[in-house]
């Protein structure tokens, strides 16, 4: 997910995306623990997407307050 795509979304959409990514991250952790994880790079990708969404959400909320 690119930052440009994330910036075009509303706060509600960002919250929904964040929730779905956290669920995916949870499932990936379980797959890793049980040895069923095939796409190991996806763990890192999901973690970075979560960080991007949190960063942009914080920027948007700071812009609203200013």
Swiss-Prot record:
Keywords: Ribonucleoprotein, Ribosomal protein. The keyword Ribosomal protein applies. SUPFAM superfamilies: Ribosomal protein L29 (L29p). InterPro entries: Ribosomal_protein_uL29, Ribosomal_uL29, Ribosomal_uL29_CS, Ribosomal_uL29_sf. It comes from the Bacteria. GO terms for cellular component: cytosolic large ribosomal subunit. Gene3D superfamilies: 1.10.287.310. One of its GO terms (molecular function) is structural constituent of ribosome. PROSITE patterns: RIBOSOMAL_L29. The keyword Ribosomal protein applies. GO terms for biological process: translation. Belongs to the universal ribosomal protein uL29 family. This is Large ribosomal subunit protein uL29. It comes from Mesorhizobium japonicum (strain LMG 29417 / CECT 9101 / MAFF 303099) (Mesorhizobium loti (strain MAFF 303099)). The gene is rpmC.
């Amino acid at each position: 997910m690119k930052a440009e795509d994330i910036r075009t979304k509303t706060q509600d959409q960002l919250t929904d995306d964040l929730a779905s990514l956290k669920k995916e991250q949870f499932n990936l952790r379980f797959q890793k623990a049980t040895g069923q994880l095939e796409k190991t790079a996806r763990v890192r990708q999901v973690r970075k997407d979560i960080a991007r969404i949190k960063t942009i959400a914080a920027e948007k909320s700071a812009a609203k307050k200013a």
